[in-house]
Design a protein with these regions (language model features):
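Hydrophobic cores of alpha-helical transmembrane segments in multi-pass integral membrane proteins
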Residues: 11-36, 49-83, 88-112, 125-145, ...
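Membrane-interfacial, low-structure loops and terminal tails that flank and connect transmembrane helices
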Residues: 1-2, 286-290, 445-468
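Electrostatic cytochrome c docking/interface patches
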Residues: 501-526, 540-541, 545, 633-663, ...
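Extracytoplasmic electron-transfer domains, predominantly the class I c-type cytochrome c fold
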Residues: 511, 515-518, 543-627, 685-735, ...
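Membrane-interface helix-loop junction between the first two transmembrane segments
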Residues: 30-45, 183
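Extended surface/linker regions that mediate inter-domain or inter-protein docking
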Residues: 457-501, 603-657, 662, 674, ...
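Non-cytosolic membrane-interface motifs at loop->transmembrane helix junctions
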Residues: 117-128, 153-157, 186-196, 254-265, ...
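Sequence/structural segment immediately N-terminal to covalent heme-attachment motifs in c-type
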Residues: 513-536, 546-553, 654-675, 753-776, ...
């Protein structure tokens, strides 16, 4: 009796895997392009960065790797068990449910704004339920044939496949459902479990199973040590889940759990060294040149080497000292690409290539597959090097007292190069897919085993130990115990510990509850992927505390369902955003971030507005309302930590207006305009509108004070994080840009003494209540205003700039329009206000009297 392979299901899942791979890679390429061309595909919510990023990661995990490994399992089960899968009819039902409901449905829902902000669990709960159902069906489909075998007959690939399916079925709900039931820090503990379990108990067992299977099938030799393979298998399921919390080191999670995760990460590296040694020695004992001759074997060998590299890298970056430096940077993104594209995808490609060579009636192009191998090796290698370099640069800049935008600017060349690498990877994926549909066609024939043949592997000559040959109950029970241990140690324990800590530490009267509008804003923040650029956790590190403020406490997160701590920072952390910037700034920044910061790579959100930043929809207002809840409870109870004072350079360098203009264009032109006239779209949308720097001569004291401390009541932030040389350069530039000029004699409505007295009368009538009798901005009404009225001792307006202000007012400030003033009165009050200026520049006499101060005496 012959045991056939379900070849139609193998083909179906293989083709589905290729479609998923190409689409997922296109999602990723679009995401990469948006880093250096943020306006690319930006006019529709479905194409925003966050949603495409969600579909990229979920597509790689489920559409590509999931289908690839399922196809391989269909091929491998008859060889490993000498039995067919449970039911081909069940297989087709599972195929359509998995691909058309879970994957395609998940992609569609994410793009339409239905998702969850959980790493590697972005598909919404309704799709998560379908995936969990599919995992259960996989256990029925593939697990039953394995369970009918004796433990002593099961090859190590079977152990990995069965263990991966079983423990993924158990772990998947922890990262997808529990964070919705446990808020903030408590939910983060379970999210951390799934972040690592997605790789550790799903991807890794499948990939290693492929490697063990292909090695013995190609070399026709036994593996080096069956004992080592079993030790590596059980250590994997013991240690890997314990790694989860290393994604949240220096957070408010219990330090004991963080230390366990750190230690487990190191032990995981040791386990991988054991597994990789066993795999490589198995190849080394084989016929010379097998790796070079067999292209799928080449993919497998590369996967094994990359498995070692990525695991050692993961162990190193989990060490707390190094983690405090490198976490949240592109180093981590390079690490994840090395894992998912390098280790996992190369293993999947090796497995698919191996089985496709043996499938009847299909085309196979060995040369195209070999070309794809080199395209992928080069593309992946360059990408990992590029992202690693970017991460080191970002981490170094974050440790310095520099504006956040400096790390974005420094990353731009790396991000451009990553897109080039991404094109190489996409080309490699396409060529790999073409190798399955071009070339000569394989002959028709039977694929499978017969009852009188052994599987295409050979048991190790090493004597089997007794505990390896006992019933499934012992070894499987040990695995369940290991899984429960990780669940208790890094899920339940932190949650209970945090619950008790939160009960004790929550201050009385803490403002934690969110309004319906704020909750809706949080939902918008989640579905658009904001948590994948901005973390919501200030870590307990000196660099975080200096830059963002007080570290995030667990009690502050009790209303976050689910938590959105994040694992990457492209933009700054927002955990202390409440009250930091005015609402008008937030709205302009949402509409188009480059209106505020020209070098920003944040996507714009025009669909949240009715054509301009001054016409926000309710969604935009709700999103801003949510941003202003972040850190609100702490801010209301604890005084904000003072920022480090700016230390002025001792020696004043030579004035460098070119350097100052460069700094101005990079940091200030978004609001103030390229000509410093306040006429940018973003600047005119702010309230108060951006200041017309070109229309005023400003004193050095005012410039330096404003750059150092910002302008309270306006969107003008502090720039005391600029390097001292840039700070002085832009200050010098601002001192030079305002050229108020003088009145030509033929432009004067009256002699200067008449202008002075007339202006004094207009000022006393209309301006003194706010600007004060001495025009110092300290009038009885002005002292209650933010921003404070102009202090004319520190600024000299030009006549055209003052005329515009008197005619139109300053929208968003206490300065009203005075449209009834005549041109002569406008000139007179401007002349009078200019007379108070005491900074550098032309001085104007203050007249003590005039022969006539009547306006009718002015021509």
């Amino acid at each position: 009796m012959r045991i056939p392979v379900a070849t139609k299901l193998v083909r179906a899942h293989t083709y589905a895997a290729f479609v998923g791979l190409i689409l997922s890679a296109l999602f990723g390429l679009a995401v990469s392009i948006k880093f250096h061309a943020p306006e690319f595909l930006t006019n529709h919510a479905a194409l925003t960065w966050g949603r495409l990023r969600y579909d990229h990661t979920q597509g790689i995990l489920y559409a590509w790797l999931g289908n690839a490994f399922i196809a391989f399992i269909y091929y491998a089960v008859p060889y490993l068990t000498r039995r067919t899968v449970t039911s081909e009819r069940l297989g087709w039902a599972m195929f359509f449910l998995y691909n058309f409901v879970a994957v395609l449905g998940g992609w569609t829902l994410v793009l339409s704004g239905v998702s969850q902000p959980l790493e590697w669990a972005e598909f919404p709960l309704v799709v998560a339920a379908v995936i969990e159902l599919c995992l259960g069906l996989m256990i029925v489909q593939f697990g039953i044939p394995f369970l009918k075998c004796g433990a002593s007959e099961l090859y190590v690939s079977g152990w990995y496949l069965l263990g991966g399916l079983t423990f993924t079925f158990l772990a998947y709900p922890l990262g997808n459902i529990v964070p919705h039931a446990l808020p903030g820090a408590m939910g983060a503990a379970f999210s951390g479990l799934w972040i690592h379990d997605a790789v550790g108990v799903f991807i890794t067992p499948m990939a290693v199973a492929v490697e063990y299977f292909v090695i013995t099938a190609v070399t026709r030799k036994p593996i080096y040590s069956h004992f080592y393979s079993m030790v590596g298998f059980w250590l994997l399921f013991l240690v890997y889940p314990l790694n989860g919390i290393h994604h949240y080191i220096y957070s408010s999670l219990p330090m004991a759990a963080q230390h366990v995760s750190e230690a487990a990460s190191i032990y995981q590296g040791m386990d991988v060294i054991l597994v990789v040694t066993n795999l490589l020695l198995s190849i080394g004992l084989a016929t010379e040149g097998s790796v070079l001759r067999d292209v799928p074997m080449r993919f497998v060998w590369t996967s094994i080497v990359l498995y070692l590299l990525v695991s050692i890298q993961g162990s190193v970056q989990a060490v707390m000292t190094f983690n405090s430096f490198i976490h949240f940077s592109d180093w981590v993104i390079g690490h994840s690409h090395l894992a998912m594209i390098g280790f996992a995808s190369f293993a999947a490609m090796g497995g698919l290539g191996h089985l496709w060579q043996r499938m009847p009636g299909v085309r196979h192009n060995r040369r195209a597959m070999a070309w794809s191998y080199w395209l992928l090796v080069v593309g992946l290698g360059l990408m990992v090097i590029d992202l690693t370099g970017a991460g080191l640069v970002q981490a170094a800049l974050w440790q310095q007292h520099l504006p956040w935008i400096e790390s974005v600017r420094a990353s731009r060349p790396y991000w451009i190069f990553r897109t080039i690498d991404g094109v190489a990877l996409l080309a490699g994926f396409i060529v790999f897919g073409l190798s399955f549909v071009t070339g000569p066609r394989n002959p028709e024939g039977f694929v499978g085993v017969t009852l009188d043949t052994r599987p295409q592997h050979f048991p190790s000559a090493e004597p089997a130990h007794f505990w390896f040959t006992t019933a499934y109950a012992v070894t499987f029970g040990a695995g369940v115990v290991f899984f429960v241990l990780s669940f208790l140690a890094l899920g339940v324990y932190p949650a209970f510990s945090l619950h008790a800590s939160i009960q004790k530490s929550t201050p009385p009267g803490a403002h934690l509850m969110l309004t319906a509008a704020e909750q809706h804003g949080g939902h918008l923040y989640a579905i658009d992927g904001c948590a994948y650029c901005h973390t919501l956790q200030v870590r307990f590190t000196a660099a975080d505390a200096w830059r963002f403020g007080m570290p995030t406490q667990a009690w502050e997160t009790q209303q976050q369902y689910p938590q959105m701590w994040g694992t990457r920072r492209i933009g700054p952390d927002l955990a202390r955003e409440a009250g930091r910037r005015p609402i008008d700034w937030q709205l302009v920044h949402l509409y188009d971030p480059r209106y505020i910061a020209p070098d920003s790579v944040m996507p714009s959100y025009p669909w949240l507005f009715q054509g301009s930043p001054e016409q926000p929809s309710q969604d935009a207002l709700d999103l801003v309302a949510f941003l202003n809840t972040l850190g609100r409870a702490q801010a209301e109870l604890v005084p904000a930590q003072p920022k480090a004072a700016y230390v002025l350079p001792v020696a004043a360098p030579a004035n460098d207006t070119e350097e100052g203009r460069r700094v101005f264009l990079a940091n200030c032109s978004g609001c103030h305009g390229e000509n410093a006239d306040g006429q940018s779209i973003g600047g005119r949308s702010l309230r108060p509108v951006a200041f017309n720097l070109a229309g005023f001569r400003l004193s050095d004291a005012l410039i330096w004070k404003t750059l150092e401390a910002g302008m309270p009541g306006s969107a003008m932030p502090s720039w005391n994080t600029l390097p001292s040389s840039e700070f002085r350069a832009v200050a010098d530039y601002l001192a030079s840009v305002g050229q108020p000029g003088e009145l030509a004699p033929n432009e004067q409505y009256a002699p200067k003494d008449v202008l002075m007295e007339a202006g004094k009368r207009v000022f006393a009538t209309h301006c003194v209540r706010c600007h004060g009798e001495n025009a110092a901005g300290d009038g009885p009404d002005g002292i209650h205003m933010l921003p404070r009225p102009a202090n004319f001792h520190q600024m000299m307006p030009s006549y055209p700039a003052m005329a515009v202000i008197l005619r139109d007012g300053v929208p968003g400030s206490g300065m009203p329009a005075w449209p009834l003033l005549t041109p002569a009165e406008t000139q007179a009050v401007t002349f009078y206000a200019r007379s108070f200026y005491s900074g550098p520049g032309d001085q104007h006499p203050i007249a003590t009297g005039a022969s006539s101060a009547r306006m009718e005496a002015m021509r």
